[in-house]
Amino acid sequence: MGASHLHDDPRPGSPVDHQPTTWGGIIKKWPKQTFLIVGNELCERFSFYGMRAVLTLYFFNILNFSQSFSTVLFHAFTVICYSSPLLGSILADGYIGKFWTIFFISIFYACGQILLAFSSIAPSGSSHHPLLDLLGLLIVGLGTGGIKPCVSAFGGDQFPAHYTRMISLFFSMFYFSINAGSLISMWLTPYFRSMSCFGHDSCYPLAFGIPAILMIVATLVFMAGSFWYKKVPPKENIIFKVIGTITTALRKKASSSSTHQRSHWLEYSLDGHDCALSTECKNLHGNCAQRRYIEDIKRLFRVIVMMIPVPMFWALYDQQGSTWVLQAVGMDAKVFGFEILPDQMGVLNAFLILFFIPIFQSIVYPTIEKLGFQMTMLRKMAGGGILTAVSFFVCGIVQLFVNPTLPYIPMANEAHLTIINTIPSCDFNVLIDSREPFDLLRKSGIAPDDSVRKPISFTGDDFFQPNITFDNLAPNCPKFTAEPMLAPATSYVLTLSPNGWAYNAVRPEKPKSGKGELSMGLNLIVPCDKIPSNVTWEQCNGTEGYSGAIALCKVESDVITDNNNVCDPTAKGKFYVLSNANPLDVHDFSKKSTVTAFGRTYSPIEMKPGTYRLFYTDDSRTHFTPLNLPPVQQDHMGGQYLITVSTRSKNDSEVLATTESLVSYNRVSILWQIPQYVILTAGEVLFSITGLEFAYTEASPQLKSVVQALWLFTTAIGDLIVVVIFMLNIFSDVAVQMFVFGGIMLFVIFVFILLAVFYYEYADYSNESEVLTEKMIVDDDHTRI
């Protein structure tokens, strides 16, 4: 538009169109289509953070990956999410513009969410897993990253450039929609996950399906404003321009003669440049546009050097969604009668960031400066990095208290053995090979022990067959020798019962579902001819064990008046069935290694804490016959227990039971995670928000979009660091892992402080003759643009 037409142009955005200063004027001139962009962002952030909140537990529980590999996949997904914005920026700025980039990639994004939701319907172990899951996540990662640099910038495009007050208000609304979407979804989606659907104990199809629906809604909401949007056509991509300049400089430096030296290697790109022939230089009245551009790139490199600690910050920060969630699974989630799901703790960060930002701006920073300490940007970042490291030290200390409740896991060359004595009135003195003998007392009662006995360890390179001698002084108690065959890297339970001794492999582990459950298994050493006569669905001879199902039904009292009313198969959280049974060889005491009877060992199931009675039940779950036993009561989550049921003697139909604690229940409250979240969020305010401000203000106006892309890419690098470290499988202890990450962060911040003191000087663009209006893109993760 020529200068002669400026005063005749009545359209908004021309110099005569003054920025409104009153609320009435702002409302009148506000571009109404921006509300659709804000609504789109709200739905998209709900979609992304809702899916991401439950992702680690989905890897762990449904895809059955290890904790370490689940963490690797979570961070690999984040790498994709924060690498792909570069592609979205190139596509939008250089080819099809922001509007069409958002539209096409949103459809692609929604397809990924739908594919992930569809794949999660298949049961664990299905051939659909994990190919469809990972394909869906790849599409989601490319989609969310592709639109990330476009949506907020597209919203800013709807305003005249000089409407700075309205643009600021828009980004405040945009920022609020980001945090509102993430806050709501991170609280609700774990609840969706904890429901039951499609025959599963969890409902990941709902947890992924609702975000998929919200992504479809986000796309439709965005397209609803198509007719009214201001669509800025694509222009030269500044990222390509910078890369081209650097490439040209390196190429010309390599081919230049030794007599033709430049003061800086970037200045070689000026070879062949003639200001007299450049339109840009003419418009700057003698100033060389290309030389000033080269100076801007030099400053950019100085900013990049100061961004060295940023990837390490994200390497720590993003472990909220992986390592910290898995830590919460091993903690007591009951708080004042309510239950907090482990993947809901991330809500604390989303809430605290909204609370801390005004507190730091209005109270913390002014107070510190009144004490005579100037809060420069680099000082804030150094303080934030230190706080981030401290949060990981706190997390490591919490983990030290969690560790004693973790299961004993045998090494690759080790076998573990736990011996359970259920024989009434018999205590034993046990001698294993040439080890020191120890006393084995009889267990009485069905109530589980409050503590877990450390298993006996055998070490070697091959199978173990220890000679275990059981001796006693009682005349009616057996004296015998057991020689179980034990495999390395396996845990076993050896059970002494009135019918003989038996041993079987067990897998000590905490419940993985993250729904406040415990794990209960069963060894049943009851011959079929000793079960009640009304259990007609099992026909066998006297030596065979009962192989039908056992129901655990939640009861409120010890008195049972109607079996079928106690057991309601439709009652969620009150009815469970042990049905996956394997034969259990029962060896005779007097005949070495001779199998004289058979029992059944039932694989453990996850169930809610409470008081339960045991019932024989048929396949249709319509008939229930109680075992004449006291109820089993356990009010704590996170433990693993083994119930052993046997007859009182070989010729007796009366049954007795004991319960062994194989894995301790969760003893450390999940509330102990609050300090690490508080400290990390404070570090985020100091480091991340200030770091964004530093990177944005220290770059020249025309290179701010490059800095935006680099800022996003630091997140990808940070998560890649986590992926590499976990792939190396260095840590076996989460506490050590947290301390090491915190220590690395402190070292990086120490280097950063040295750079800030001896290397960096703040840039000054106040005398720039060219004013470029750039809109800051607010990232969806509080501070990433």
From Swiss-Prot:
Compartmental location: Membrane
Job of this protein: Proton-dependent uptake of di- or tripeptides, and to a minor extent tetrapeptides. Transport is independent of sodium and chloride ions. Protein shows high affinity to peptide substrates.
Entry keywords, A to Z: Glycoprotein, Membrane, Peptide transport, Protein transport, Transmembrane, Transmembrane helix, Transport
GO function terms (MF aspect): dipeptide transmembrane transporter activity
GO biological process: dipeptide import across plasma membrane; IRE1-mediated unfolded protein response; protein transport
Membrane-traversing stretches: 46-66, 72-92, 99-119, 134-154, 167-187, 208-228, 303-323, 345-365, 382-402, 670-690, 711-731, 738-758
Protein name: Peptide transporter family 2
Family listed: Belongs to the major facilitator superfamily. Proton-dependent oligopeptide transporter (POT/PTR) (TC 2.A.17) family.
Membrane topology note: Multi-pass membrane protein
Organism whose genome encodes this protein: Caenorhabditis elegans
Tissues where this protein is expressed: Expressed in vulval, pharyngeal and anal muscles.
Record lineage: Eukaryota, Metazoa, Ecdysozoa, Nematoda, Chromadorea
A GO CC annotation given for this chain: apical plasma membrane
Residues modified by glycosylation: 467
